[in-house]
């Protein structure tokens, strides 16, 4: 009796194992970067495609396993051979029909996912290992440049123009849309249409060098009015220092050469190699998602950049006196 109970338990466990593994796999898909919690029109279509294809795969798997078990129990003979052939051809026809239907369904979705946007255009350049973001004007205006964060208005189809000046990167924001490669010398496009507000995490999904794993970005979806207010603020020049510490930090920022690589609009800093820092204090992270944007993190980043993000182009400034680093950090904290 005990042996029989153990056998039954083992059989139940073996049958339940795939379901348990499936549930654990889905549990790992939660969070800011989940494709199964869509917050955009394109992501919702992709999630529907995933679930429908998963259901089709389960149906085919059950049919094939069931047919194999049934065929293995047939007794040899003319009758068994006829049934075996029927099972073989029936299973093949059913699987082909289901797979063809899934293919057609996927192809029908593609034109809508790639349709052009009808409003705002944003140019995003993936660079080792950060993101240059430029909001393109509708007329002859000047692009508004930012870095490592993309802000979108709720409910609008926004077209992203994606490229890279160095190696292949891949722009991937699972809650809002699919993955699109960024190829040097080419411009690829991705259209996003957010359906709810919030902050969502994205990442480079193509290995691009030493600090590939430290190349994240955020997409912040705002109500339309809030987005327009933010865009107007982002277009403005930097805020003048309002304390002696910040004024000293601005002086040192220019003196030690930070302005050769970074732009701070409204000052003599006009470098284009690194991120635009005009409103760096309004961003949530430093170093493309590597550190939170706090006072201590700013000091660490300035003093020992290369240890935090290997092979990054920005040199470490640890040789500067501690008070100088603190002053530069205070200045950057004021650039909201």
What are the roles of these predicted feature ranges?
Residues 20, 24, 58, 62, ...:
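Alpha-helical transmembrane spans of integral membrane proteins, capturing the lipid-embedded, hydrophobic core
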Residues 30-49, 73-272, 287-310, 316-330:
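Non-transmembrane, membrane-proximal soluble domains of secreted or membrane proteins
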Residues 42-62:
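Membrane-entry segments of alpha-helical transmembrane domains in multi-pass membrane proteins
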Residues 61-75:
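Alpha-helical transmembrane segments
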Residues 335-336:
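Short, solvent-exposed mixed-charge patches
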